[in-house]
């Protein structure tokens, strides 16, 4: 440093080392969840909190553990729910049940006969399909060199994969005038997003939501009522500002081995316009599929227009009806064509899935509200920073011994927060945070902006008026969270700016 002799520089270095030898502070002082859009670190490890503590003279990373107090945990849960855009903690009626003690064979047989609910720890068809979507997103992120969370593989317990139907023979494929039916099961199961159209739906959507069928019992077949199989879905819990970009109804088809084993079926899905007591309902044809009796897997029907109508005018939501006609023009019971209803296995239940994208007006309103909260937080933190602004040039001698600005590990555990009953995946994610000194000279690895370099020079000349540059995120990535809502519908939502990927001086 100009004006200081060799001995004086050595004394300054020694004094800086002496002042930095105290016990390292707990960092961050309060666990806050992931880095938000304004660069503010939100982060949490639940209970316990895990934050990286870089030792003063060691490059190895360790973790500090501290049990959260009740009010701290409650406040942290509230803040993370706010980041996730949820007004309260969902409490689904049929969420993720924890595995229980083994049951007797007689009890197990009676439970399998009822088939109303899956065994504890197992998922129904809609959550399994959404889990496939989640893992598909995670796989794409890994291929791009980005790990946004912990993947969760679906259990292979005899379920039919949400992958497209098995073809009976190479020559039969040409008879299907729509998308191919579903692919092989769990052994070599492919993602359900096998078409470019489905991939585009997922890439363009901010949120994917599945809906369970609300019809408790399948109606008995009646020759007078051709469209007898009905399905109803509750779309009242869609968040404000979300618009439907695509929607599909999915029903599982088993292989037919009875009297119709050599038949070809025309399966039609209708929107119910008006219900009548003594005659068939007024219906509007939405989509059709032609399938072979020997095919099995998930069938998809496009109901995008109907879903948009139901969202805008909920009173028009009277459900869907399905009919099956043979090539001879005979209307048959869908069960005879292999279609699975409410009385079928829990992992083959029919469901609806919709893709949503948030409107720009709602995004601007949300951002303005959240920015005001962050500004209040910054104002409180700035008051404490002003006290320590009066630094001198000798600070840079001592700061050279501190860790330079870089990314540190910070893991947010949803399981530690007690949310394992409604968050399906991930169990947690690496939020990370930025910390360290932005000391002069700013090296290339500090990712300093030109403004930060100029601010550093001005700080050297006027340390009492101009603060040092701050270590802040320069690259933020999104995560995907799969969870239940209060109605046991499954939601897959992307959250932007949740993971710190790189840090720099600003």
From Swiss-Prot:
Bias category Polar residues: which stretches?
386-397
The protein's location, in the record's own words, is:
Secreted
Q: Where are the transmembrane segments?
A: none
What InterPro entries does the annotation carry?
Cystine-knot_cytokine, TGF-b_C, TGF-b_propeptide, TGF-beta-rel, TGFb_CS
UniProt xrefs under SMART domains: TGFB
**Sites where a glycan is attached:** 234, 262, 379, 397, 447
Instruction: Locate the compositionally biased regions of type Acidic residues.
Output: 140-153
Span of the secretion signal? 1-20
Presence of the UniProt keyword Signal in the record: yes
**Annotated Low complexity bias:** 96-112
- Give the multimer and partner information: Interacts with SOSTDC1. Interacts (when glycosylated) with type I receptor ACVR1; the interaction may induce HAMP expression. Interacts with type II receptor ACVR2B. Interacts with Hemojuvelin/HJV. Interacts with ERFE; the interaction inhibits BMP-induced transcription of HAMP. Interacts with BMPR1A/ALK3. Forms heterodimers with BMP2 in vitro; the heterodimer then binds to its receptor BMPR1A /ALK3 and may induce HAMP expression.
Query: Under which name does UniProt file this protein?
Result: Bone morphogenetic protein 6
Which species is this UniProt entry from?
Rattus norvegicus (Rat)
Q: Which gene encodes it?
A: Bmp6
């Amino acid at each position: 440093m100009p004006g200081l002799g060799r001995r004086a520089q050595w004394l300054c270095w020694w004094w800086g080392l002496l002042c930095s030898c105290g016990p390292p502070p707990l960092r961050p002082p309060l666990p806050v969840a992931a880095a938000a859009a304004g660069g503010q670190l939100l982060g949490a490890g639940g209970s316990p909190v895990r934050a990286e503590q870089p030792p003063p003279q060691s490059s190895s990373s360790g973790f500090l553990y501290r049990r959260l107090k009740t009010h701290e945990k409650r406040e942290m849960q509230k803040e993370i729910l706010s980041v996730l855009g949820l007004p309260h903690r969902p409490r689904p009626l049929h969420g993720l049940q924890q595995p229980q003690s083994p049951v007797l064979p007689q009890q197990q047989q009676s439970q399998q006969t009822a088939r109303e609910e899956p065994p504890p720890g197992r998922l129904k068809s809609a959550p399994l399909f959404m889990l496939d979507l989640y893992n598909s997103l995670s796989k794409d992120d890994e291929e791009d060199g980005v790990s946004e969370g912990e993947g969760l593989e679906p259990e292979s317990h005899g379920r039919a994969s949400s992958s497209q139907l098995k073809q009976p023979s190479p020559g039969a494929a040409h008879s299907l005038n729509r998308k191919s039916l579903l692919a092989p099961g769990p052994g070599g199961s492919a993602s359900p997003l096998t078409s470019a159209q489905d991939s585009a739906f997922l890439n363009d959507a901010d949120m994917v939501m599945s809906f369970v069928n609300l019809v408790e019992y399948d109606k008995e077949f009646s020759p007078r009522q051709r469209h007898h199989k009905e399905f109803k879905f509750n779309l009242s819990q869609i968040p404000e500002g979300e618009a439907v970009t695509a929607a599909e109804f999915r029903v599982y088809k088993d292989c037919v081995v009875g009297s119709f084993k050599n038949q070809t079926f025309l399966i039609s899905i209708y929107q119910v316009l008006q219900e009548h007591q003594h005659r068939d309902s007024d219906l509007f044809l939405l989509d059709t599929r032609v399938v072979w009796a020997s095919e099995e897997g998930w069938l998809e029907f496009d109901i995008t227009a109907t879903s948009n109508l139901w969202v805008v005018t909920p009173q028009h939501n009277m459900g869907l009806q399905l009919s099956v006609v043979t090539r001879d023009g005979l209307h048959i019971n869908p069960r005879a064509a292999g279609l699975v209803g409410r009385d079928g296995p829990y992992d083959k239940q029919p469901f609806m899935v919709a893709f949503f994208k948030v409107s720009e007006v709602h995004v601007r309103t949300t951002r303005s509200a959240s920015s005001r909260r962050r500004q209040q937080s910054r104002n409180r933190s700035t008051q404490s920073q002003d006290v320590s602004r009066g630094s001198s040039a000798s600070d840079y001698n001592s700061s050279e011994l501190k860790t330079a600005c870089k990314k540190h590990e910070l893991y947010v555990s949803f399981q530690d927060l007690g949310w394992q009953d409604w968050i399906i995946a991930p169990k947690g994610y690496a939020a990370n945070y930025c910390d360290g000194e932005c000391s002069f000279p700013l090296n290339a690895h500090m990712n300093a902006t030109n403004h930060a370099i100029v601010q550093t020079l001005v700080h050297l000349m006027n340390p009492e008026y101009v603060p040092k540059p701050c270590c802040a995120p320069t690259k933020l990535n999104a995560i995907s969270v799969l969870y239940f809502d209060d109605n046991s519908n499954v939601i897959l939502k992307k959250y932007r700016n949740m993971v710190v990927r790189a840090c720099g001086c600003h």
